[in-house]
Amino acid sequence: MVNSTHRGMHTSLHLWNRSSYRLHSNASESLGKGYSDGGCYEQLFVSPEVFVTLGVISLLENILVIVAIAKNKNLHSPMYFFICSLAVADMLVSVSNGSETIVITLLNSTDTDAQSFTVNIDNVIDSVICSSLLASICSLLSIAVDRYFTIFYALQYHNIMTVKRVGIIISCIWAACTVSGILFIIYSDSSAVIICLITMFFTMLALMASLYVHMFLMARLHIKRIAVLPGTGAIRQGANMKGAITLTILIGVFVVCWAPFFLHLIFYISCPQNPYCVCFMSHFNLYLILIMCNSIIDPLIYALRSQELRKTFKEIICCYPLGGLCDLSSRY
């Protein structure tokens, strides 16, 4: 694993390490069939500095999201609590990837004891990444269910989604995902683990799709019903739909950024000897970059879609360190 990393192959799960090993051996076999060393099968190299930089950016952005939600009481709602959980998962994925790059780079050695220590550290980090991936999936699904309740059970929503209940849900998500992530790494030599991850990904997509088909088909009818109620029912329902659209964007970005990695796993399981599959898997480092980009893009989506969150970001970034400057700008 260390030697393959030294050749520019960054890994993030032990099962990915196996994929990288097999990829290298498959590439060597295929090269003997007419492919050159500089061809498609040469593993795409990405500088460790890129992973570290993306990890730092993601860390700062997602900490800002968490602090903003904690600071602003107007954001103390179930949807934003689930977004906070998603931000923690995003942050852990990126920071773990960046940390793994640093660890492997610093401890890269031919010494057997050093390699054994590196593998152990790598497995711990891989467990964090795997747990965070599962938590991201569960958090997105929780946000989808929350949006479903706000639209179809608007009058009973506050009785259904209480703060205490949301806290229990988030705690259960992280407890279950942590245990699952550790077990996945312990038994990562089994192809069943990869199949399980792939199944969870596509099951999540199927559940999201079914929720959204029902949600958007019936949304107009419920908006009309709420509109005849006294008060600001129509305005509230419009805000709920805006939250559903925000979630749609988040899921779309998640799928775009994670799909290449899961396709990589599918190819690893189904066609590890196929030249086209090997060619696709040779860009593994690029798929890791996409995963880290997802963690960077999500906070930007929160900011663009929520005026309240944007305002809180501005207060944290500008008004605290540069209070005098903010006061001066507000006068003019």
UniProtKB/Swiss-Prot annotation:
The keyword Methyltransferase does not apply. Changing residue 252 to S: In OBESITY; uncertain significance. A lipid is attached at residue 318 (S-palmitoyl cysteine). Changing residue 325 to F: In OBESITY; does not bind alpha-MSH. It is found in: Cell membrane. One of its GO terms (molecular function) is neuropeptide binding. Gene3D superfamilies: Rhodopsin 7-helix transmembrane proteins. Glycans are attached at residues 3, 17, 26. The keyword Iron does not apply. Changing residue 219 to V: In OBESITY; shows significantly impairment of cAMP-induced activity in response to melanotan II compared with the wild-type receptor. Changing residue 127 to L: In OBESITY; signaling properties in response to alpha-MSH, beta-MSH and gamma-1-MSH are impaired. InterPro entries: GPCR_Rhodpsn (IPR000276), GPCR_Rhodpsn_7TM (IPR017452), MC3-5R (IPR001908), Mcort_rcpt_4 (IPR000155), Melcrt_ACTH_rcpt (IPR001671). The chain crosses the membrane at residues 44-69, 82-106, 124-145, 166-186, 192-215, 249-271, 281-304. It comes from the Eukaryota. Pfam families: 7tm_1. Changing residue 102 to S: In OBESITY; shows the same affinity as the wild-type but significant impairment of cAMP-induced activity in response to melanotan II compared with the wild-type receptor. Changing residue 122 to N: About 50% loss of alpha-MSH signaling. Changing residue 126 to Y: Complete abolishment of receptor function. Changing residue 72 to K: In OBESITY; loss of plasma membrane localization; loss of receptor function. It is a multi-pass membrane protein. GO terms for biological process: adenylate cyclase-activating G protein-coupled receptor signaling pathway; adenylate cyclase-modulating G protein-coupled receptor signaling pathway; feeding behavior; insulin secretion; positive regulation of bone resorption; regulation of eating behavior; regulation of metabolic process; response to food. Belongs to the G-protein coupled receptor 1 family. Hormone receptor that acts as a key component of the leptin-melanocortin pathway at the intersection of homeostatic maintenance of energetic state. Plays a role in regulating food intake: activation by a stimulating hormone such as anorexigenic alpha-melanocyte stimulating hormone (alpha-MSH) inhibits appetite, whereas binding to a natural antagonist like Agouti-related protein/AGRP promotes appetite. G-protein-coupled receptor that activates conventional Galphas signaling leading to induction of anorexogenic signaling in the hypothalamus to result in negative energy balance. This is Melanocortin receptor 4.
